[in-house]
A protein has these predicted regions:
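Conserved helix-loop functional segments at active or binding sites
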Residues: 53, 229, 266-270, 355, ...
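Active-site-proximal loop/turn and secondary-structure-junction residues that shape catalytic pockets
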Residues: 70, 127, 239-242, 250, ...
Length: 394
């Protein structure tokens, strides 16, 4: 089959809509269940490239959680800790025995659960039962993978009253070297982004501190691969094999860094005992808990703590999580990696990154203020690599 008719394009008024192969060859995907839409396929094809790249770069199964053609989270399949299992709401499952692929999706979904609500999932490996059971309990639009075990497929087919979107992709498919995009009746042509992210790209270390651990190299590569498929401008914070904050689609570089940094801060604040032990009512769903936590750790905390409000969510009124307590907890976050899809024009990005525990940075370099950026990195003992490669994605 070389074309697939879709219900509509980006919006219901944009008809007709389809995906097809211009050369008449077969599509590299098969819809096993549901009726994926235009944006679903945009997420699926971008996400599949991302997880394929992660698997190739690290040798580990990978997963990503996409929303509106940018990743909310992405990760490789490293084991979960008890704390991560709690903040990702999988501690009621057999998380200690999760498959690596299930661990990857738990991490990808868990990094920014607010943004991942209603995600499209991409998996680097054949979807197994563990991963399918994890997906089954989350609000999600669909999944793409190179295959599904029989058990996993039956589990996924039960989602959304049988309408959950399940796509299988030919993992051996190689697109043409040139890609085309039409805007306002004008066709754009460019070579595909086939750049491989590897250790050699990290070799130009420009800071006084030049000590890169193997874990830091892994996380730097992960950050750059995530940025490769994130709408620009973009910045990505990574720790322990997973994104913990993605700032996408901002016109200002420092706003990217602030956005991603705040998401990273929220990820770490959720691990504080004061948040882990919030007295939720048993009737409160995971999504409602995510929303409540997001407000509780933010500046508008009285929206959930005011009299007449806290009773809706908690069995007893929680104490305020003070600014001083939050700062003291965040000061314990260390060894975070930061990637940027283009150079940092000012050192304010580094100052903000430092507040979120960043120690390792990968960016192209090339700003007229590189010296000031390097000086600020040296002030904090950071390690920064100039990759020489821009990673814009539109």
């Amino acid at each position: 089959m070389n074309e697939l008719e879709l219900k509509y394009g980006c919006n219901p008024n944009q008809k007709p809509s389809r995906i097809y192969m211009e050369d008449g060859s077969d599509l590299p995907v098969t819809v096993l269940n549901g009726k994926p839409g235009y944006i679903n396929f945009l997420d699926a094809f971008n996400g599949w490239q991302l997880v394929s790249n992660l698997k190739k770069a690290t040798g580990l199964p990978a997963a990503t959680s996409f929303k509106h053609v940018s990743p909310a989270g992405a990760a490789v399949g490293l084991p979960l800790t008890e704390t991560l299992a709690k903040i990702y709401w999988v501690n009621d499952m057999d998380w200690k025995n999760f498959s690596p692929l299930a661990c990857a999706y738990a991490r990808a979904r868990g990094a920014d659960r607010m943004s991942s609500f209603g995600d499209f999932i991409s998996l680097s490996d054949v979807c197994d039962k563990d991963t399918a059971l994890l997906i089954k309990r989350e609000v999600s639009d669909g999944v793409i993978a190179p295959g599904y075990t029989e058990e996993a497929l039956e589990i996924l087919k039960q989602k959304k009253k049988g309408n959950y979107n399940v796509i299988q992709i030919d993992e051996n498919f190689v697109p043409a070297p040139l890609e085309h995009k039409e805007v306002f009746g004008v066709t754009f042509e460019q070579g595909r982004q086939e750049l491989e992210i590897d250790d050699a790209m990290l070799s130009n270390i420009v800071t006084e501190n030049k000590e890169l651990t193997e874990e830091a190299k892994r996380d730097m590569k992960i950050s750059l691969i995530i940025l490769k498929y994130t709408q620009s401008n973009s910045v990505c914070f990574v720790k322990d094999g997973q994104a913990i904050g993605v700032g996408a689609g901002q016109q200002s570089r420092v706003h990217c860094t602030r956005l991603a940094g705040q998401k990273a801060d929220n990820w770490f604040l959720r691990q504080c005992p004061k948040v882990l032990n919030l007295p939720f009512k048993d009737t409160i769903s995971r999504a409602e808990r995510d929303n409540a936590i997001d407000v509780y750790i933010g500046d508008e905390y009285m929206d959930v703590l005011a009299d007449g409000m806290w009773e809706k969510t908690f069995t007893e009124k929680p104490e305020v999580f003070t600014k001083e307590e939050k700062r003291a907890w965040l000061d314990q976050m260390t060894d975070v990696t930061l990637g940027s899809d283009a150079f940092f024009p000012f050192s304010d990005n580094i100052e903000r990154a430092h507040k979120s525990g960043v120690k390792y940075i990968a960016q192209p370099g090339g700003s007229v203020r590189d010296d000031a950026v390097i000086e600020t990195c040296n002030k904090y003992g950071m390690v920064m690599s100039f990759t020489g490669i821009r990673l814009f994605h539109h």
